Amino acid sequence: DDAGVGLAGIFPRRFSPATAHLKAAVDSGRFGRISLVEATIKWWRTQAYYGSGAWRGTWDLDGGGALMNQSIHTIDLLVHLMGDADHVQADAALRAHSDIEVEDTAAAIMRFQGGALGVVQGSTACWSAGGHPAEIHICGEHGSVFMSDDKFRVWEFAEESSTDQDIRLEFAAGGAGAGAADPSAIDFSGH
């Protein structure tokens, strides 16, 4: 502020059509009391990926590891949907890579302001031939939704609305996640 310079993060997943439906379901109370939420990013990055740029895997230039770089968009989406957490307990480790300063694996347990319990798992040490999608799960007393990237594997509520079947058809989840195993597969809309 003093220098007259603004800084903002870009979190485009907040604005996807699928997210709009999920946010509306959360905000309108369709889940009832939400009990459990989860953000899971189980991706793979090769050692060559980290070696291809001097900034990758460093505290000074990358700002963090698997959570700050690869998982940040999914974590932001979870907070966008659920609000802030009152309590967080976490741990991190370097499990599959060498010559990097930051974590490649982390897990956290949290309690959100509304009382829901949550889990975040973020890693670039989970090998997969095709990659695992980034996942958001929200489960409550009246509904459950499992979001894979920007598609839904599960969209279920105790009371069906007139748009539920259309949402399931339009946003049906398919194959592996873009960028999960190949960072060049993330298109401009994911950044």
Feature names for model-found ranges:
Residues 2-6, 115-117:
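A short helix->loop->beta-strand "cap" motif at the edges of active sites that frequently abuts
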Residues 69, 75-156:
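Contiguous beta-strand/loop segments that form the cofactor/metal-binding neighborhood of enzyme cores
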Residues 1, 33-44, 70-73, 98-102, ...:
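Phosphate-binding glycine-rich loops and adjacent basic patches that engage nucleotide phosphates
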Residues 112, 134-137, 141-191:
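C-terminal glycine/acidic-rich active-site capping loop/insertion
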Residues 40-42, 58, 91, 123, ...:
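Generic beta-structure capping elements
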Residues 5-6, 13-100:
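Predominantly a Rossmann-like dinucleotide-binding segment in NAD(P)-dependent oxidoreductases
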Residues 63-65, 95, 124, 182-187:
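Active-site rim elements
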Residues 11-14, 124-126:
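Structured beta->alpha junctions
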